[in-house]
Amino acid sequence: MEQFFELLNNGQRDDALKLMDEKVEMRVHVGDNARTLRGVEQVGGWFLRADKGMRMIPANERDMGQNLEIDLMVMRPGVQSQHLDATFRVEAGKITAINFAPR
């Protein structure tokens, strides 16, 4: 995961996406709703469309076996930073699932 965030934060988003499984799923919670994206095209597109200056700063990583729980700070130009509870599932070296929920 360290490599994923390093690539993402250095603007190498295409390379960061190569760390995802083709069938990756991502759930983004906003308020009482959740949106699920499936496949590297949809999930990767979410990261590629994000603001160019977006940074995701991980902290307090907790290894739960296949899942990694992370306190994540998201910074975007001109917008107040946001703290998220993030869970990443990694199988065979590939990210297979991502879950973002506001704190």
Segment roles from a protein language model:
Residues 81-103:
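Short beta-strand edge/turn micro-motifs at domain boundaries
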Residues 11-27:
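Short, well-ordered alpha-helical segments enriched in acidic and aromatic residues
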Residues 1-12:
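Short, aromatic-enriched amphipathic alpha-helices that serve as compact interaction elements
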Residues 26, 61-63, 100:
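Hydrophobic/anchoring residues in structured secondary elements
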Residues 38-81, 85:
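Surface-exposed, charged secondary-structure patches
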Residues 25-35:
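A short gly/proline-enriched turn/hairpin at secondary-structure junctions
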Residues 20, 74-76, 102:
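Short beta-strand segments enriched in hydrophobic/aromatic residues
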